[in-house]
Regions:
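Dynamic helix-loop-helix/coil hinge segments at AAA+ ATPase domain boundaries and subdomain interfaces
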Residues: 1-25, 214-215
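AAA+/SF3 P-loop NTPase mechanochemical coupling elements
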Residues: 92-101, 130-147, 158-167
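Walker A/P-loop
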Residues: 33-70
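P-loop (Walker A) phosphate-binding loop of NTP-binding proteins
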Residues: 44, 78, 146
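C-terminal engagement/docking regions of AAA+ P-loop ATPases
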Residues: 1, 235-321
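Conserved alpha-helical scaffold flanking the Walker A/P-loop in AAA+ ATPase domains
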Residues: 28-31, 84-104
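Conserved AAA+ ATPase core "coupling" helix
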Residues: 75, 79, 155-209, 217-227
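Conserved AAA+/SF3 P-loop NTPase catalytic/coupling segment centered on the Walker-B
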Residues: 97-124, 138, 153-162, 174-182
Length: 321
């Protein structure tokens, strides 16, 4: 376990050369990498979301591509297309930017549904079809999609079924005053600071195997299942004491959320140098895993209740094993 903790600490140290005050964002993205899942990031422009994922790709020695999603984007612009070569009289494949290890899907909610579907299909299946041929995407394959919480005009909201495919949703906030002072003094020179490759793709895959092997007691699994049960409105009819929570939820989390929570909890334990999962690991990842999987009711909007507040209430309500 110590070697994995050392590798992750090296990754954090390299990221800190460029990124100030975004320790939580870095740790959460690294968690998603090891858990082999994709991430949706919400935050206003200028909070170093692009710099964070680009830096992590460099540290891991992975190929990085950025796709700027716009209303006029076509699925072929993402996945690739067939090009007719007149001198040969044949079609050749031109692969799209999705053929990379790390993809930044910038402002994914700016593109129409058919483009979102093409991107999300690639995320889920790890392959794309161009013409009549199906092509495997490179491994490891990681997508970080961003969306802006403001300026919602001209956007296409991601359907709940598609949101569920993201392992985590991260919310990036403004840096603290002392960190912002350091950022301003750097005058935007952070992207030019060199970083070293400290974790190879082979080591990343090895770390994923180690995370899968983390011990998880049945009591922890029961704890996760109980958390999911309270997110479902039907639970209010069986457990009246949870009604104060479920009345704010229109649709709850699916079993996929439980799988994601267990995966992330195992990685959290690995990063802490443990070979077993504690309830604290589940609590540490609960907000990131659940916040985009809860569809809130009109009552929640009326009372100005957020998904994070509901998740906090659920964690307080469920007994810790």
């Amino acid at each position: 376990m110590e070697k994995y903790v050392e590798l992750i600490n090296k990754c954090r140290a390299e990221c800190a050369k460029r990124l100030v005050g975004q320790d939580a964002l870095i740790n959460d993205i690294l968690t998603a990498f090891v858990a082999d899942g994709h991430v949706l990031v919400e935050g206003v422009p200028g909070l170093a979301k692009t710099l964070a994922i680009k830096t992590i790709a460099e540290i891991l020695g992975l190929d990085f591509k950025r796709i700027q999603f716009t209303p006029d984007l076509l699925p072929a612009d993402v996945t690739g297309t067939l090009i007719y070569e007149q001198n040969k009289g044949t079609f050749s494949v031109r692969k799209g930017p999705v053929f990379a290890n790390v993809i930044l899907a910038d402002e994914i909610n700016r593109a129409p549904a058919k483009v979102q579907s093409a991107m999300l299909e690639a995320m889920e299946e790890r392959q794309v079809t161009i013409g009549e041929e199906t092509y495997k995407l490179p491994s490891p394959f990681f997508v970080l999609a961003t969306q802006n919480p403001v300026e919602q005009e001209g956007t296409y909201n991601l359907p709940e079924a598609e949101l569920d495919r993201f392992l985590m949703k991260l919310v990036v906030n403004y840096p603290a005053a002392e960190n912002e002072k350091l950022i301003v003094k750097s005058c935007g020179k952070a992207p030019a600071i060199p970083v070293q490759t400290v974790l190879t793709p082979v080591q990343l895959l090895d770390m994923r195997k180690a995370a899968d092997g983390i011990t998880c007691d049945d009591k922890i699994v029961d704890y996760i299942v109980n958390i999911l049960a309270v997110t479902r409105p039907v639970a209010a009819t069986k457990e009246k004491s949870s009604h104060d929570i479920t009345r704010y939820i229109h649709f709850g989390a699916s079993p996929r959320a439980g799988i994601a929570m267990l995966q992330c909890a195992k990685v959290n334990a690995l990063f802490a140098g443990r070979d077993f999962v504690l309830p604290e690991d589940v609590k540490a990842v609960a907000n990131n895993v659940l916040r985009h999987r809860l569809v809130l009711s009109y009552e929640a909007a009326a009372d100005n209740i957020t998904a994070d507040e509901i998740i906090s209430r659920i964690l307080d309500f469920i007994p810790v094993p």
